[in-house]
């Protein structure tokens, strides 16, 4: 009630509208800085050189080298890389399987097992590890992501714990597959 009463008794309400607008209009128009717009016609090379000189003075964004590498970076990039490697290998083998008969080659299981039997064991074991590691890592890290989708293990400690578990399980299962 008091706020309404003091508002009604304000002296500015009793002035005519022309008096209220006149002083404000005069002072703001006097203080406005007017600048004419200058344009110039540039050739393409002049425009490119001006743009290049402006780019020199722009601030650079931070590079990845200023950040401390973390396990989560490595596992995320390795998950993407192994996904591409596994999918690329699958597609390459499928295309080879389809195109081989057209080129006069046989790419059936008997031929592949015959070729693998000719390879010495000291080459087969590391080769099987190298072949199986991307697949096992991608599978276990995919399971890790599915666990995260259930909102479990999302703490910093849980993320690192599951990351080390994925690495250990991938190495162990790849080693097992290499020894078979």
UniProtKB/Swiss-Prot annotation:
Binding site for heme: 138
GO molecular function, one term: metal ion binding
TM regions (residue ranges): 83-103, 123-143, 160-180
Keyword terms: Electron transport, Heme, Iron, Membrane, Metal-binding, Mitochondrion, Mitochondrion inner membrane, Transit peptide, Transmembrane, Transmembrane helix, Transport, Tricarboxylic acid cycle
Gene Ontology BP term (one): mitochondrial electron transport, succinate to ubiquinone
Protein's pathway: Carbohydrate metabolism; tricarboxylic acid cycle
Chief localisation class: mitochondrion
Keyword Nuclease: no
One GO cellular component term: mitochondrial inner membrane
Cofactor entry: heme
One Pfam family per UniProt: Sdh_cyt
Subcellular compartments: Mitochondrion inner membrane
CDD domains: SQR_TypeC_SdhC
Membrane topology, from the record: Multi-pass membrane protein
NCBIfam families per record: succ_dehyd_cytB
Subunit details: Forms part of complex II containing four subunits: a 70 kDa flavoprotein (FP), a 27 kDa iron-sulfur protein (IP), a cytochrome B and a membrane-anchoring protein.
Stated family: Belongs to the cytochrome b560 family.
Name of the protein in question: Succinate dehydrogenase cytochrome B subunit, mitochondrial
Source organism (scientific name): Schizosaccharomyces pombe (strain 972 / ATCC 24843)
Gene: sdh3
């Amino acid at each position: 009630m008091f706020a309404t009463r003091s508002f009604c008794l304000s002296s500015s309400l009793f002035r005519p509208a022309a008096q209220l607008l006149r002083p404000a209009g005069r002072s703001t128009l006097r203080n406005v800085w007017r600048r004419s717009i200058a344009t110039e016609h540039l050739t393409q090379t002049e425009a490119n050189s001006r743009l290049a000189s402006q780019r020199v003075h722009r601030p650079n964004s931070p590079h990845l080298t200023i950040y401390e590498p973390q396990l989560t970076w490595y596992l995320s990039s390795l998950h993407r890389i192994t996904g591409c490697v596994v999918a690329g290998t699958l597609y390459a083998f499928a295309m080879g399987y389809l195109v081989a008969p057209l080129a006069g080659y046989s790419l059936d299981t008997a031929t592949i097992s015959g070729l693998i039997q000719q390879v010495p064991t000291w080459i087969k074991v590391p080769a099987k590890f190298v072949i199986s590691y991307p697949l096992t890592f991608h599978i276990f890290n995919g399971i890790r992501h599915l666990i995260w989708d259930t909102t479990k293990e999302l703490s910093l400690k849980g993320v690192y714990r599951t990351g080390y578990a994925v690495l250990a399980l991938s190495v162990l299962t790849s080693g097992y597959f290499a020894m078979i």
